[in-house]
């Protein structure tokens, strides 16, 4: 995945037509498009392939299963054009290693801590431990919340500079893109504040400009 704008679009649309229109409008501004189950369940897994023709695609499936099932999901997503797949780290080393082994050159990002308030109840308490496990298992990067920049710093202190950190929660959830980058994130992830706006391209450009202020 290129590292130009440091901006990733979380395209949580359920309409394939609208998703493609938004993807086309932000082409050249965002470094990747992240899709989740709502779009895939509504329009089918072929959306991975169609969007991959416009941008790198991150499949945010937050895979949390036994190793064999993890392997099947990752292989399927990559075969359809995914550049990366997001998996949960709490499943343990065997499932994480299965994801890495099945990636076929695509990148695997492990969730250490999600961006919503409820994340602090359980997984946040083990974020650093899961980050260390991810490094041991060979994942390419980690998910840490832009809504809590101090947690980005904590994960960065564990994983070092050789691993990517992607930070969701910018925009609608209250996080600020430049704060996340300043805290150590490589990319910020923005969803509704871009695809739900009247002018997605202008909104994406505004977030990219905010990021540039700290580069």
Please place each PLM-identified region on the residue numbering.
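Alpha-helix-loop-beta-strand connector modules within alpha/beta enzyme cores
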Residues: 41, 45-61, 101-113, 153-170, ...
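Conserved N-terminal beta1-alpha1 strand-loop-helix module at the mouth
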Residues: 1-59, 64-72, 79-82, 121, ...
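A C-terminal functional module that forms or caps the active site or interfaces directly
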Residues: 139, 146-194
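Short beta->alpha connector loops
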Residues: 13-16, 38-41, 89-93, 146-150, ...
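Conserved anion-binding
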Residues: 2-7, 65-149, 161-162
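Short, acidic/turn-prone active-site loops that include or flank metal/cofactor-
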Residues: 62-65, 90-91, 113-115, 170-173, ...
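C-terminal helical cap(s) of enzyme catalytic domains, especially alpha/beta-barrels
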Residues: 99, 179-215
């Amino acid at each position: 995945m290129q590292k130009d704008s440091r901006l990733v679009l979380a395209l949580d649309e359920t309409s394939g037509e609208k998703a493609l229109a938004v993807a086309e409008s932000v082409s050249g501004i965002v470094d990747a498009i992240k899709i989740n189950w709502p779009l895939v369940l509504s329009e089918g897994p072929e959306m991975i392939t169609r969007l991959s023709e416009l941008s790198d695609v991150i499949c945010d499936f937050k895979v949390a299963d036994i190793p064999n099932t993890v392997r099947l999901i990752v292989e399927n997503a990559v075969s359809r054009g995914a550049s990366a797949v997001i998996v949960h780290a709490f499943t343990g080393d065997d499932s994480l290693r299965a994801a890495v082994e099945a990636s076929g050159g695509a990148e695997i990002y492990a969730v250490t801590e999600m961006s919503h308030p409820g994340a602090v109840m359980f997984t946040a308490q083990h974020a650093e431990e899961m980050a260390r496990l991810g490094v041991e298992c060979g994942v390419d990067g980690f998910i840490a919340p832009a809504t809590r920049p101090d947690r980005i710093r904590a994960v960065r202190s564990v994983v070092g500079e050789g691993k990517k950190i992607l930070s969701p929660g910018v925009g609608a959830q209250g996080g600020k893109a430049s704060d996340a980058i300043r805290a150590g994130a490589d990319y910020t992830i923005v969803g509704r504040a871009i695809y739900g706006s009247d002018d997605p391209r202008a909104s994406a450009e505004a977030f990219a400009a905010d990021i540039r202020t700290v580069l």
